[in-house]
C-alpha cells in the first residue's frame, strides 16, 4: 500500500463505507449473540454507531495506514500486515465501542463483555476488516492505492 497523499474524497468515502458496513454487521452479531443485549439495545447501539463511524472512519484509515507503515519497518511479510491490522483495529475501536455501549444504556457487565469479546474476536476481525477496507478502497478506485504483496 502506498503512503497517502493529500486528502482524497474517494479515500474518505471508501473508508467510511467500509467502517459503517463492517461495524454494523459485526457489532450486532456480538451484541446479541455474545453479550446478551436485546435486539432493541443492539439496534440502538448500531444506529448510534453509524454517525460515530462516519466521524471516525477516515481518521481510523489514517491511523491504520500509519500502523501498517510501522509494521512494514519491522517486517514486510503478510503476517506483519495482519498483526498491524489487528493492533490498529483494537487500539482504535475499543474505546469508541465502549462509549457507544455506555451511551445506549448497556450495563457495565455488558460493556465489559462486549468490548472484551470484540477485542478477542478482533484477532480475526481486525484482519478481516483490513482486507474488507483494502477491497473497498479498490472498489472506490482510490487514487494511488495499491496493495503490497506479501
Curated annotation (Swiss-Prot):
<keyword id="KW-1133">Transmembrane helix</keyword>
<dbReference type="GO" id="GO:0034639">
    <property type="term" value="F:L-amino acid efflux transmembrane transporter activity"/>
</dbReference>
<keyword id="KW-1003">Cell membrane</keyword>
<comment type="similarity">
    <text>Belongs to the AlaE exporter family.</text>
</comment>
<feature type="transmembrane region" description="Helical">
    <location>
        <begin position="86"/>
        <end position="106"/>
    </location>
</feature>
<keyword id="KW-0997">Cell inner membrane</keyword>
<keyword id="KW-0472">Membrane</keyword>
<keyword id="KW-0813">Transport</keyword>
<protein>
    <recommendedName>
        <fullName>L-alanine exporter AlaE</fullName>
    </recommendedName>
</protein>
<dbReference type="GO" id="GO:0032973">
    <property type="term" value="P:amino acid export across plasma membrane"/>
</dbReference>
<feature type="transmembrane region" description="Helical">
    <location>
        <begin position="48"/>
        <end position="68"/>
    </location>
</feature>
<feature type="transmembrane region" description="Helical">
    <location>
        <begin position="17"/>
        <end position="37"/>
    </location>
</feature>
<dbReference type="GO" id="GO:0005886">
    <property type="term" value="C:plasma membrane"/>
</dbReference>
<keyword id="KW-0812">Transmembrane</keyword>
<dbReference type="Pfam" id="PF06610">
    <property type="entry name" value="AlaE"/>
</dbReference>
<feature type="transmembrane region" description="Helical">
    <location>
        <begin position="111"/>
        <end position="131"/>
    </location>
</feature>
<dbReference type="InterPro" id="IPR010574">
    <property type="entry name" value="Ala_export_AlaE"/>
</dbReference>
<comment type="function">
    <text>Exports L-alanine.</text>
</comment>
<keyword id="KW-0029">Amino-acid transport</keyword>
Amino acid at each position: 500500500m502506498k503512503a497517502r497523499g493529500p486528502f482524497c474524497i474517494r479515500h474518505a468515502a471508501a473508508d467510511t463505507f467500509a467502517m459503517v458496513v463492517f461495524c454494523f454487521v459485526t457489532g450486532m452479531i456480538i451484541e446479541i449473540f455474545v453479550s446478551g443485549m436485546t435486539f432493541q439495545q443492539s439496534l440502538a447501539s448500531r444506529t448510534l454507531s453509524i454517525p460515530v463511524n462516519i466521524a471516525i472512519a477516515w481518521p481510523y484509515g489514517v491511523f491504520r495506514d500509519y500502523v501498517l507503515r510501522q509494521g512494514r519497518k519491522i517486517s514486510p511479510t503478510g503476517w506483519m500486515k495482519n498483526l498491524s491490522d489487528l493492533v490498529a483495529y483494537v487500539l482504535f475501536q475499543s474505546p469508541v465501542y465502549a462509549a457507544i455501549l455506555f451511551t445506549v444504556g448497556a450495563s457495565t457487565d455488558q460493556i465489559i463483555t462486549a468490548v472484551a469479546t470484540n477485542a478477542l474476536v478482533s484477532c480475526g476481525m481486525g484482519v478481516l476488516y483490513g482486507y474488507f477496507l483494502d477491497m473497498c478502497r479498490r472498489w472506490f478506485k482510490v487514487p494511488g492505492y495499491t496493495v503490497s504483496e506479501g
